[in-house]
Amino acid sequence: MAKRLVEELERDGIVKSERVKRALLTVPREEFVLPEYRMMAYEDRPLPLFAGATISAPHMVAMMCELIEPRPGMKILEVGTGSGYHAAVCAEAIEKKGRIYTIEIVKELAVFAAQNLERLGYWGVVEVYHGDGKKGLEKHAPFDAIIVTAAADVIPPALIRQLKDGGVMVIPVEERLGQVLYKVVKRGDKIEKKAITYVMFVPLR
């Protein structure tokens, strides 16, 4: 089922690299969804978790992962851990060589994600924190890439500060006509923003 889904994403031009393709084929999405949704794990759609959160649709995970151009040795910050699936895909995309710090504001979700990631062997590559992701994780900055999995009203200044010069942030932003996914590249004290597509995420809390 995973193979068929990934082939569809490849045909649609969403999966572009072997790294992301391999990551999506390796990470068992059914291990990151609630038991009642396991049969739907390889449908290309978001699925409910709890506390109003969702696990993102596979095409969105693939798109965001491709946008950061993953490579071994990267230090990545994820804001909005959810069930841990997105972090696991990123870990595989960097060949588990590097570090992913992921922060979740809902304590129950942070615990759920940590359990999933530890059970599946990602401990040591992925570190889960409970806290306000808008503030980032200053003690581990700067980051090569930042992925935000909830829609912000504005790009949080703390996240821009914690992005390495030349680093990439992928973030959905609430705008007048809807949410827009941006690829943000830091250039010295400035940022370059590129609109990618319209999206629908839960709000960044």
Curated annotation (Swiss-Prot):
Sorted alphabetically, the Gene Ontology BP terms of this entry are: methylation; protein modification process; protein repair
Q: Name one Pfam family in it.
A: PCMT
Report if keyword Methyltransferase is assigned: yes
The positions flagged as active site in the entry are: S56
Q: Which UniProt keywords apply?
A: Cytoplasm, Methyltransferase, S-adenosyl-L-methionine, Transferase
Q: Where in the cell is it found?
A: Cytoplasm
- Its Enzyme Commission number? 2.1.1.77
The question of whether Oxidoreductase is a record keyword is answered with no
Q: Tell me, what is one Gene Ontology molecular-function annotation carried by this entry?
A: protein-L-isoaspartate (D-aspartate) O-methyltransferase activity
Q: Which reaction does it catalyse?
A: [protein]-L-isoaspartate + S-adenosyl-L-methionine = [protein]-L-isoaspartate alpha-methyl ester + S-adenosyl-L-homocysteine
| InterPro entries in UniProt | PCMT (IPR000682), SAM-dependent_MTases_sf (IPR029063)
Task: Provide GO CC annotations from the record.
Answer: cytoplasm
The similarity comment for this entry is: Belongs to the methyltransferase superfamily. L-isoaspartyl/D-aspartyl protein methyltransferase family.
State the protein's purpose.
Catalyzes the methyl esterification of L-isoaspartyl residues in peptides and proteins that result from spontaneous decomposition of normal L-aspartyl and L-asparaginyl residues. It plays a role in the repair and/or degradation of damaged proteins.
Q: Which NCBIfam families match?
A: pimt, PRK00312.1
What is this protein's name?
A: Protein-L-isoaspartate O-methyltransferase
Which source organism? Pyrobaculum aerophilum (strain ATCC 51768 / DSM 7523 / JCM 9630 / CIP 104966 / NBRC 100827 / IM2)
What's the name of its gene? pcm
